[in-house]
A protein has these predicted regions:
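Structural signature of nuclease core domains in nucleic-acid processing machines
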Residues: 1-225
């Protein structure tokens, strides 16, 4: 039947009306959007200096440092590094290998800096702040066409630390990448920080006044927004 054959051919060749929307994922993570923007993950050519001790290798040491900054009672006036590491191991927050991999000099430098002083004296501190918000696909840089640019998409993630200062929020993102300057971190992760800003402002209904990257490798910081 030629008529039937014609209709089948037309159906096969006809583009699905909502094909552009089908290409949009149901959810994204803030970190994956950052990697998509650069086209690859940030490459660590050599191990950061603070990762040169202990038996843990590679990204696991970076994870250990993030876990330490998440759970350690670093804002206590009676903070003691040795005692705190023992407590974290005893309570299961860190393994002994992770505790051994923490560079005490890097922690000391961070805690003696201006950023830490601001965090400690702030009105409120939120560590490892988890969020789940809706954003337009254009912010996630995955919009297929102009028609889908404003289509909402679910985004989730976690902010290393945020604190409230003078009624506004400040976001702090710790990075362990081996780099020559904090400017290179800003280039690679600026989009991620802007997504964090959007998420925190939605979740807490508060203005974010600053987004800061702190390099544990260099002991330096750079403001993104």
């Amino acid at each position: 039947d030629k008529e039937l054959e014609k209709k089948l051919t037309e159906n096969i060749e006809t583009k699905y009306k909502y094909q552009d929307f089908v290409a949009i994922p149901t959810k994204v993570s803030a970190s994956s959007v950052s990697h998509k923007r650069t086209g690859k993950s940030f490459i660590v050519k050599t191990k950061p200096k603070f990762m040169n001790t202990g038996k843990i290798k590679g990204a696991s040491r970076g994870t250990a440092f993030h876990e330490f900054l998440h759970y350690a009672d670093i804002f206590s006036d009676s903070f003691n590094m040795t005692a705190e590491l023992k407590r974290l191991v005893s309570n299961g927050f860190l393994s002994q290998e992770q505790a051994d991999a923490i560079d005490r000099n890097a922690v000391k430098k961070f805690m003696s800096g201006e950023l830490f002083a601001r965090m400690k004296s702030s009105e409120r501190i939120m560590r490892e702040y988890r969020f789940a918000v809706m954003i337009p696909t254009k912010l996630a840089e995955i919009a297929v066409t102009d028609e889908t640019a404003d289509t909402p998409i679910f985004m989730q993630g976690a902010i290393d630390c945020a604190f409230i200062e003078n009624g506004k929020a400040v976001i702090v993102d710790y990075k362990t990448d081996r780099i020559d300057s904090v400017e290179s971190l800003a280039e690679s992760y600026s989009k991620q920080l802007l997504l964090y800003k959007n998420a925190l402002e939605q979740s807490e209904e508060i203005e974010v006044s600053e987004c800061i990257i702190y390099s544990l490798e260099l002991g330096e910081q750079i403001r993104i927004c």
